[in-house]
């Protein structure tokens, strides 16, 4: 009877999914457990990263069910986004048709992997029943003052004639057509995430179940800085430039100011000056560089003098105003003070443009007459008027107080985090539920009129505006306030909005009256185990935390953090690089499943590396896992016939060892899955137990009761990893009930106390023999046993024993000469 994985896997998948085996409700007496993998963009085909992500989640789900939990394990589709629109442009396929076809194919692939989802809870963000509530979320944010519109510089692709999100710009070029990306000033919608910056930062420390590296990444992204906001009067303009600094103690060392080229005051300052033309050319040039390029330490600092001057608030002296590549308009105030003596970036800029360098902090052993680089350390203030002689840490406070008293500044906390730009000039996204009326201005669509549906008949040729702008039946509407003709907002929402609340919708996916019932969300959430790639460590996870806090504040939920525990899995590599079409190193999951089966694919992907590490693909590794499952199959088929003989001998000399190994493996697998996420070592211990079972079968007479107990528990242990073969062998062996309804085995602590132990005997460091001896044997008894052994006697003949070293219960080393 061969291991026919195709037949076995098809049989069990049919049974599971036709019977809704993994459907759950909230009325179970069991404790709840919500395990969730980040839902995929429906590109049409699963890749190995998906297989890894969903296999990890399925181990948790199947394990926790057997541990007695009511497990919610749903799946859905992050279905809006640019690729669908690009497919429409390239192939003439409507984004909706393309997306739903892809969903159908990927759903089939997931079922063929045997992932235990409750498919009754499936959601797709592009379905009107879902995006109706995405639009509802927007309206709640708008009512709470968290959604607003303003002009903003955005990424602009001149070839595609469209705005691009930051993530669609790679090395300064359009991800799709590779054109250089510039900047364009447009009216855009934003979410006021900065209002939540302090809470988002503070509550990171509550996330005990998150990897430290992810918490650090979020802290750095939020980027809290304490300092002062200082105002410099612009000479002759009657306006002020605000700068933020963490070093107000260096204020007397300011010898110039730098504005971002896009700063709203730049054009006013240069207007009519000889430098105007040169500055305008520089501003144009900056539009073709992205933020990473402009702020990189490897990028040469470049600037232009504006011809304007600012008045120093403490000295009254004029300081020149420059524009430069390294200052960004939407970071801080878009302006910085140049203190070349005490900031290395400013030092390099001052040297390049021959600007004065004024030392105002004297550190121990610093030659202030001959600075070779900026001195950024602590010290005592000099050249700082009435503040001379103060320690710089004390001067920070004193100077800030002086500025505040005289109306030139104040103590301030700022964040690197910027408000979330949510407008997208694309078709395939959730329409922003806003109407523009000449009389009433900006008017939100009433909730009862949601969803604002995406029209099907649209033209996808890129023009620089959303395709919706050219769809008259969509654009032309009536004002909900006054009933006069009005125009709909034609931008759609960033797809990150759809994925910032989907985990709530899974709790109540068919509710047509509200996004979710509060009692259901409060029952299931927070998510107990969230699993996804570390590339989502910042944006998706931060936005989800933001959404959760807003919904908590608005009274829709009773908790402030969405994900209790987070596991970020590593990438799947081949030949040391991430799998990609361009490198030609993609391995198709479908081909692996077809050739070896889903259980083999799952086993390899879980065995080859710990979940959080990158995994190197290995054809030999896959073959090895396939051989292991074949060995497992053969053992059970052979033993089934032998165990039908009820007159088997009752005892074997290996019984104690088998019982020990069984209990050890139960303990190891339980802890590796439930506490350490070390699936690879759990599988390794299962493989070792199989090897011993073969030894037991060959060497000992079978203890029927013990071997049946071992075989039964073995299948439960391997079930979360390879469920199809486990279910099939359980049925073949005639074990009682359904393996999916049994309890996870408990280990017997007393069985883990070994009666015998194997001692390796070395002579001059080389293992020459092994002895099976009682655990409590004395050193003298052991020495006698070894010295009486014929093989050892021969090896020691004519030699002098210098030392007899015994490491209890492990080894003996006899040193001879």
Swiss-Prot record:
Gene3D superfamilies: 3.10.20.590, HUPs, Isoleucyl-tRNA Synthetase, Domain 1
Cellular compartments annotated: Cytoplasm
EC number: 6.1.1.4
Keyword Coiled coil: no
Keyword Cytoplasm: yes
Known catalytic reactions: tRNA(Leu) + L-leucine + ATP = L-leucyl-tRNA(Leu) + AMP + diphosphate
Enzyme class: ligase
Keywords carried by this UniProt record: Aminoacyl-tRNA synthetase, ATP-binding, Cytoplasm, Ligase, Nucleotide-binding, Protein biosynthesis
Transmembrane segments: none
UniProt-recorded Gene Ontology molecular function terms: aminoacyl-tRNA deacylase activity; ATP binding; leucine-tRNA ligase activity
Binding-site residues for ATP, renumbered to this chain: 581
Protein family (similarity comment): Belongs to the class-I aminoacyl-tRNA synthetase family.
Name by which UniProt lists this protein: Leucine--tRNA ligase
């Amino acid at each position: 009877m061969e291991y026919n994985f195709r037949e076995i896997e098809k049989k069990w998948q049919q049974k599971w999914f036709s019977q809704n085996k993994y459907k759950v409700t909230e009325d179970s007496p069991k404790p709840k457990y919500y395990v969730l993998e980040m839902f995929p963009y429906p590109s049409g085909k699963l890749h190995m990263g998906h297989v890894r992500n969903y296999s990890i989640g399925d181990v948790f789900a199947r394990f926790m069910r057997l541990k007695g939990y009511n497990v919610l394990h749903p799946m859905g589709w992050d279905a809006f986004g640019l690729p669908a629109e690009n497919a429409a442009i390239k192939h003439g396929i409507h984004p909706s048709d393309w997306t739903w076809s892809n969903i159908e194919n990927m759903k089939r692939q997931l079922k063929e992997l045997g992932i235990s989802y409750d498919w009754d809870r499936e959601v797709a963000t592009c379905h009107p029943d879902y995006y109706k509530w995405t639009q509802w979320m927007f309206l709640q944010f708008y009512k709470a003052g968290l959604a607003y519109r303003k002009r903003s510089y955005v990424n602009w692709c001149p070839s595609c004639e469209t705005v691009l999100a930051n993530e669609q710009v790679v090395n300064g070029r359009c991800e799709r057509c590779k054109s250089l990306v510039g900047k364009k000033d447009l009216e855009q919608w934003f979410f006021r995430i900065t209002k939540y910056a302090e809470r988002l930062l503070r509550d990171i420390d509550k996330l005990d179940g998150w990897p430290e590296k992810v918490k650090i990444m979020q802290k750095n992204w939020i980027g809290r800085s304490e300092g002062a906001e200082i105002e410099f009067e612009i000479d002759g303009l009657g306006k002020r430039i605000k700068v933020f600094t963490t070093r107000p103690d260096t204020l007397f060392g300011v010898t110039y100011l730098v504005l971002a080229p896009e700063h709203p005051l730049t054009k006013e300052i240069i207007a009519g000056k000889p430098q105007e033309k040169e500055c305008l050319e520089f501003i144009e040039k900056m539009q073709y560089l992205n933020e990473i390029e402009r702020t990189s330490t490897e990028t040469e600092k470049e600037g232009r003098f504006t011809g304007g001057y600012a008045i120093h608030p403490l000295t009254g002296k004029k300081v020149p105003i420059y524009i430069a590549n390294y200052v960004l308009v939407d970071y801080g105030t878009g302006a910085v003070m140049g203190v070349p003596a005490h900031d290395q970036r400013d030092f390099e800029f001052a040297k390049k443009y021959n600007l004065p360098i004024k030392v105002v902090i004297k550190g121990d052993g610093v030659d202030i007459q001959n600075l070779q680089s900026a001195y950024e350390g602590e010290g005592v203030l000099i050249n700082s008027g009435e503040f001379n002689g103060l320690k710089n840490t004390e001067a920070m406070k004193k100077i800030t107080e002086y500025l505040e008293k005289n109306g030139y500044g104040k103590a301030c906390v700022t964040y690197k985090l910027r408000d979330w730009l949510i407008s997208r000039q694309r078709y395939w996204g959730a329409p922003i539920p806003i109407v523009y009326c000449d009389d009433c201005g900006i008017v939100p669509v009433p909730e009862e009129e949601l969803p604002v549906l995406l029209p099907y008949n649209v033209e996808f040729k890129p023009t620089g505006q959303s395709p919706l702008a050219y769809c008259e039946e969509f654009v032309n509407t009536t004002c909900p306030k006054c009933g006069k003709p009005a125009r709909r907002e034609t931008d759609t929402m960033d797809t990150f909005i759809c994925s910032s609340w989907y985990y709530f919708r899974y709790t109540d996916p068919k509710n047509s009256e509200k996004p979710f019932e509060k009692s259901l969300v409060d029952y299931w959430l927070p998510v107990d185990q969230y699993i996804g790639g570390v590339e989502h460590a910042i944006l998706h996870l931060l936005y989800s935390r933001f959404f959760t806090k807003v919904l908590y504040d608005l009274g829709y939920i009773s908790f402030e953090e969405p994900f209790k525990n987070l596991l970020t899995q590593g990438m799947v590599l081949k030949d040391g690089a991430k799998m990609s079409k361009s490198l030609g190193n993609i391995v198709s999951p479908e081909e692996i499943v077809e050739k070896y089966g889903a259980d083999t694919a799952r086993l390899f992907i879980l065995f080859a590396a710990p979940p959080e590490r990158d995994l190197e693909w290995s054809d030999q590794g896959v073959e090895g896992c396939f051989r292991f499952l074949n060995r497992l199959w053969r053992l059970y088929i052979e033993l089934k016939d032998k165990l039908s003989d009820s007159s088997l001998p009752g005892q074997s000399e290996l019984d104690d060892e088998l019982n020990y190994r069984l209990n050890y493996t139960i303990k190891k697998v339980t802890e590796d899955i439930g506490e350490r996420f070390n699936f690879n070592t759990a599988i390794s211990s299962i493989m070792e137990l199989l090897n011993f079972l073969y030894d037991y079968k060959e060497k000992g007479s079978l203890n029927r009761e013990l071997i049946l107990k071992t075989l039964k528990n073995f299948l439960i242990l391997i079930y979360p990893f390879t469920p199809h073969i486990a279910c099939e062998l359980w049925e073949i062996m005639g074990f009682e009930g359904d393996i999916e309804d049994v309890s996870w085995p408990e280990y017997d602590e007393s069985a883990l106390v070994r009666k015998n132990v194997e001692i390796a005997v070395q002579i001059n460091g080389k293992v020459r023999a092994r002895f099976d001896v009682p655990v409590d044997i004395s050193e003298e008894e052991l020495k006698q046993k070894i010295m009486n052994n014929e093989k050892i006697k021969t090896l020691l003949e004519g030699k002098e024993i210098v030392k007899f070293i015994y490491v209890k219960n492990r080894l003996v080393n006899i040193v001879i000469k």
